[in-house]
């Protein structure tokens, strides 16, 4: 009994020496730990951002089948860039899309059909599309996007050289056909009469949707077209084979197709901003600036919102596959935890110069993170 009393006295004495327990100190320690966790999260997101930007550069070159970024100067771009209205409108559309999505609230819609514009430049013709051994303008090859989607519109754009005095110009578009018995090689497509004022040349568009539809149904009938634009004196004003100083004035096709949707609507994941303290798997904003890369060869867009995924994945939270949780419950040690990854991505349209100085308008798949989840 006496030993027990001595032990109690010693215990009380030590409590008095140690002083009262400071609950505020524990709170401060907890708060410091939380702040340290938030700082680590910010640092993690910074590293993720840098890695994502480098990955995007590699992906773009790979998906465009380019080993390195084309070395094209800004001066060369100014000389090569076509001055045609539809291309200028296309560039303007990139600006409109950028402004419309600047708040980050818009998401690519995979449910509804979308109309896309494809700019097709003429290619070199083969012997079959030549007349008397001379190549004729113009022969067009069509990508699978045009072949396998609904055709909405097809316009042939031609540039007419300026006239010195007011003139009436007769424009004729002819379709090349296989030689007939009488030697005929052409059949008419369109003809129109234009009144031109002196001073400047003009771009003129001609509807060729019916012709293009026939070509798509019977590819072997596509031997090319002949373009003529004669004034009263018989001078051909159409630029078919550009002369020096006529860069960017080559005829081309502007084709609009409706892209069929392939996926249905799904629920959205979490969206966060760069100042968010959310620790769970979330989509964060990330803007890719091609000018900052020094990639002048990309005409449009100059920048776009790519986004990235970051955060922790607890089981059952935003999991892509419901059975993932059941597998973990059955064997918690034998299954790796879920990771925060993109569960939905969308493409971007891009207007760019390839390594040969040609202008290409195409779609690069899976370049924008639309939704993040755990899988």
UniProtKB/Swiss-Prot annotation:
Post-translational modification: Synthesized as large precursor molecule that undergoes proteolytic cleavage to generate an N-terminal propeptide and a disulfide linked C-terminal dimer, which is the biologically active molecule. The circulating form consists of a latent complex of the C-terminal dimer and other proteins, including its propeptide, which maintain the C-terminal dimer in a latent, inactive state. Ligand activation requires additional cleavage of the prodomain by a tolloid-like metalloproteinase.
Effect of residue 94 to L: In mh; Piedmontese breed
Domain of life: Eukaryota
Location(s) in or outside the cell: Secreted
Signal peptide (residue range): 1-18
Glycan attachment residues as annotated in the record: 47, 71
Main location: secreted
Annotated site residues (Cleavage) in this chain: 98-99
GO cellular component: extracellular space
Record Pfam families: TGF_beta (PF00019), TGFb_propeptide (PF00688)
Function in brief: Acts specifically as a negative regulator of skeletal muscle growth.
Oligomeric and partner information: Homodimer; disulfide-linked. Interacts with WFIKKN2, leading to inhibit its activity. Interacts with FSTL3.
Illness association: Defects in MSTN are the cause of the double-muscle phenotype or muscular hypertrophy (mh), an autosomal recessive disease frequently found in the Belgian blue and Piedmontese cattle breeds. This disease is characterized by an increased number of muscle fibers (hyperplasia), resulting in an increase in muscle mass of 20-25%.
Family of this protein: Belongs to the TGF-beta family.
PANTHER family according to UniProt: GROWTH_DIFFERENTIATION FACTOR 8, TGF-BETA FAMILY
Protein's name according to its UniProt entry: Growth/differentiation factor 8
Protein's gene: MSTN
